[in-house]
Structure formats: C-alpha cells, structure tokens
Amino acid sequence: MCIRDSYHINCAPHFKGSYTSNELPHFIANLPFECRGNTELGQLLAQVCTAHGVETLAHHATTLGPEYGTLVPLRYMNADQHFKVVSVSALCMAHYLDDSAQLGWAMRQAIEQHYDGTVAFLASGSLSHRFAQNGLAPEFAFKVWSPFLEQLDARVVEMWKAGQWKDFCGMLPEYAAKGHGEGFMHDTAMLLGALGWSEYGGQADVVTPYFGASGTGQINAVFPVTPVTGRDIPPVRASAANGYTSVATRL
C-alpha cells in the first residue's frame, strides 16, 4: 500500500476478497484471493522495529486488504493457503532508504530472537520500473522501456550474482532515481537490511531470467541468508530528523 508517514504492517487474522488493480485494471481484474494472516508476528515486528527507532504500526483489526505486491506472489506460491501472510507497506512516498534498511534488520532481529517459527521475506518490487508511454503499451508488453534501463538492470543483476553488495548498496539511491524504481526501491532496501546490507556475503540465485513487462524490468531471485553482525546497517534518519531536510539528504 502507498504510505506517507511511518511504516505499516497489515496483520489481519484472515484475508479474503477480490482484487482489481487501480493501475492496470484491464490486466488484473476481479482476482479472487484468500490466505491466513499472522497477527502475532505482525505485532512483534512492529514492536521491535519501533524499538530500533523506525516507527511502525501493526493493523490487525482492519478492512484493508493486501494489494498487488502481496497478491501476485501468493497466487503462485500459496494457492493451498499453507503459509500465513503478513503484508508490509513498501510504496513509501516520503521515507529514507536508510530507515527501510534498518526496518529490514529490525525484522530479522525480531524473528531470530523472539519468534518461534520459520519466516520468508519476499521483496515484491522490480528492477527498473518505467512503464511504456501511453499508446505504446501493447508494443512493450514484453519489453523494457529503454536500452539504458535494460543495460542498467543487467549490470545490477551481475552485481547481485557476484555478491558485490558494498557497491550495490552505495549506488542504490541513484539506481532508484535513474531507474524509475517502484516505490523508490524501498522493498530492496528492506530486503538488503534484513540480509545485513553491505556486510551481506551471499550471492543471488536467479530463478527466472531477466524479462521485460510493460516497459519494466523483472526478475525472480533467491537471496540465501548468511550470518552477519549488523555493523553496516545505516543509522535511522526520520527519528533523528530536525526540521526540513533537502531532497538529496532524504535519498
């Protein structure tokens, strides 16, 4: 969901409904969904994230349903409703990437230190995310919008596969800006925070090769969890902010 203040976790006990995309209603319309929620985990995550200085609210008594970023993975990975689901807002409109990295790290700490169970993190976003210009959508249904964005994505994927996380984390703000990142790639910052940020020593295992969709760059990859200390996680920004900050600072 799109958020403008704090971070939000949708942890209702049960989700059921029908979804139509407000972005591409002719592509995704009346999609039925149902899954079990996990109120206990959602509330724990919010508590620990807030303790880490990242204000996070858990919503269990809500009529708000999951959206595209949650529903698409569920359609292909949870048709039997085996897994419980917690939805974390990642379309962040006025947030610091550093705070999203800290959020991811705090969630890992919550799970490893306080939760009795196995949890998977799904960062549901994209690489470059420049939709095809109006009138050209059919032509770019299975293409990336520009050669620049396609080459930019290709280099990023190679960095992931080679484990070049220090370089990638350093370039993430500029990549998010110049690559038209969906939600400014806060989902990626959260994922890398959970993995240890630039300290992370794993390599991405590409499940489906890079492909274009409506002008955007897409991939499915698995990032194995490795032992880390958290020493490279960026400090929080929002809770330490004092009045107006420039756009460059917020990035």
Where are these regions (language model features)?
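Structural motif
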Residues: K84-V86, T118-F121
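Acidic/histidine-rich, metal-coordinating catalytic segments
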Residues: F121-H129
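Short, small-residue-biased leader/transition segments that mark boundaries at the very start
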Residues: M1-I3
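Non-transmembrane, aqueous-exposed alpha-helical and coiled segments at domain scale
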Residues: W105-V119
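Flexible, D/E/H-enriched segments
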Residues: D5-Q102, Q113, N134-R250
